[in-house]
Swiss-Prot record:
PROSITE patterns, alphabetized: RIBOSOMAL_L2 (PS00467)
GO terms (BP aspect): mitochondrial translation
Matches recorded under InterPro entries: NA-bd_OB-fold (IPR012340), Rib_uL2_dom2 (IPR014722), Ribosomal_uL2 (IPR002171), Ribosomal_uL2_bac/org-type (IPR005880), Ribosomal_uL2_C (IPR022669), Ribosomal_uL2_CS (IPR022671), Ribosomal_uL2_dom3 (IPR014726), Ribosomal_uL2_RNA-bd_dom (IPR022666)
Domain of life: Eukaryota
Family per record: Belongs to the universal ribosomal protein uL2 family.
Record text on subunit structure and interactions: Part of the 50S ribosomal subunit.
Protein name: Large ribosomal subunit protein uL2c
Keywords per UniProt: Chloroplast, Plastid, Ribonucleoprotein, Ribosomal protein
Annotated Gene Ontology cellular component terms: chloroplast; mitochondrial large ribosomal subunit
Amino acid sequence: MAIHLYKTSTPSTRNGTVDSQVKSNPRNNLIYGQHHCGKGRNARGIITARHRGGGHKRLYRKIDFRRNEKDIYGRIVTIEYDPNRNAYICLIHYGDGEKRYILHPRGAIIGDTIVSGTEVPIKMGNALPLTDMPLGTAIHNIEITLGKGGQLARAAGAVAKLIAKEGKSATLKLPSGEVRSISKNCSATVGQVGNVGVNQKSLGRAGSKRWLGKRPVVRGVVMNPVDHPMGVVKGEPQLVEKNPQPLGVILHLEEEVEKGINIVII
C-alpha cells in the first residue's frame, strides 16, 4: 500500500495515513442511494448494537461478483475507495464497451488486463471454475451456489486455498480456518483481496472514526447505576457482580427461601 505523506502541521495529519493510489470519484451509472435506518437501533428505537451511529452518507457501488463477461478481456482503469467495505474496488473497461466494478486483487495496478471464463490463464484477477484450477491455488470471491456470484472471501486481505478435488466437489480452506466442500463448477477469482494492511492504518483523530459511523466505547463501571448494571454511585466502593447482565437487560431476581431444619424428637 503506497502511503501519501503530508506536511505535519496538525496532529491529525501527523498521525493519519492515506493511500495515495486510491480515488473516490465513482461513475454515476454504477452507484445508487440506499436508505439507512437508525444505526444500531431496532424498529422501536432501542439500542440493539452498541457503539454505532452517525457517519457520513454512503452511495452503494454495484460490484460485479458474478464475473459473467466470459472470454472478454478487460483493463483496470482506476482503483477506488468503497465506503461500504474495507476492500478497494477497481473499474474495469471490457473490450465490448462494458464497464464494471470488481474487488481489487492484491498487487493489481492500473493498466493490467483480466479475463473470466473456462480454461483462462491462472493469473491474478482472472475468474474461472474451480475444476480448471490446480491444487494449492490462492483464490477469493468464491461462489457457493453456481451462477449466484461470489459470497466467500471478499473482505480486505481475505484469501482461501483449494486443497482437494474429488468427484463433483472441491474442498477449500477458508480464511477462518474452516474446511468447506462446494461444487467444483463454482467459479472463483485467482489471488488475494487487496488492502491487506487495513488493520494497521491509523485514522489520526477521533473525527475520522465518527465518519465511519462508530461511536465512543465507555466502560460500564464509570457509568451511573441507572445506565449500566456495573455502574456505581460516587463515593461508594466499586463492588459489582462477577457476571452481570448485559446493558438494557432486566434482571429477574429470585426470592431466596430459607431452608428450615426439621427435627423429630422420639
